């Protein structure tokens, strides 16, 4: 059977289809749009994607995403941020969701995921030891566990609480209030919902 589409277009469709949430038909539309669009658009897109790995890195303290030219996250180095309070999140994009509420003025710690045995992710693969070190070094007074309202997020929250207590650390541990529906990732929650969740956080 003869090839229906040029190989370059087929390759673009296949690669775009690797993106999460992008099905075959959507990948076809995106690829065809880029083909019809001004050549400079495709070049700018390709350049931006190429710069992702060279221009972005993880903060060695908070594990938030920062420019490759930065030493640490500005959300940590900023003297106006309260280092005595840490919001623990699963992924870097969760920070954006909480920052948009304008209600949190502490610092963040990105775990890099959540405990999920079915996906082969255990606590040893998360940035938990670094969190413990930060708690001791910065003399942190409160940890807000802001993991997602999912089975994995809850499992991670419970593990963190037990790990901190077992380590003999005396600290206030809170969890975001249940304004966030079960099964909804933090980055998709509305600003109002997150504001209520922060205000109504409870002892954990």
Locate each region found by the language model:
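Extended, structured, electrostatic nucleic-acid-contact surfaces
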Residues: 1-20
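Cys/His-rich short segments
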Residues: 48-95
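Basic, flexible Lys/Arg- and Gly-enriched helix-loop patches that mediate nucleic-acid binding at interfaces
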Residues: 62, 71-78, 104-106, 110-133
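Acidic beta-strand-to-loop metal/phosphate-binding motif
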Residues: 85-90, 140-152
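Short Gly/Thr/Asp-enriched flexible loops that form oxyanion-binding sites at enzyme active sites
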Residues: 152-167
């Amino acid at each position: 059977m003869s090839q229906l589409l040029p190989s370059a277009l087929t390759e673009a469709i296949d690669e775009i289809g690797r993106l999460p949430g992008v099905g075959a038909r959507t990948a076809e539309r995106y690829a065809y749009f880029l083909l019809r669009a001004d050549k400079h658009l495709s070049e700018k897109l390709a350049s931006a994607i190429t710069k992702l790995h060279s221009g972005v890195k993880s903060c060695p303290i908070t594990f938030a995403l920062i420019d490759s030219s930065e030493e640490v996250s500005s959300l940590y180095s900023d003297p106006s941020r309260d280092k005595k309070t840490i919001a623990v999140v699963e992924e870097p994009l969760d920070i954006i969701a909480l920052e948009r509420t304008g209600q949190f003025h502490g610092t963040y710690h990105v775990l890099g995921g959540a405990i999920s045995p079915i996906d082969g992710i255990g606590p040893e693969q998360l940035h938990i030891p670094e969190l413990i070190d930060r708690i001791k070094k910065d003399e942190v007074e409160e940890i807000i566990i802001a993991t997602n309202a999912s089975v994995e997020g809850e499992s991670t929250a419970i593990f963190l609480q037990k790990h901190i207590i077992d380590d003999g650390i005396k600290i206030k541990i809170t969890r975001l209030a249940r304004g966030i529906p079960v099964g909804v990732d933090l980055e998709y929650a509305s600003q109002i919902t997150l504001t209520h969740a922060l205000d109504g956080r409870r002892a954990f």
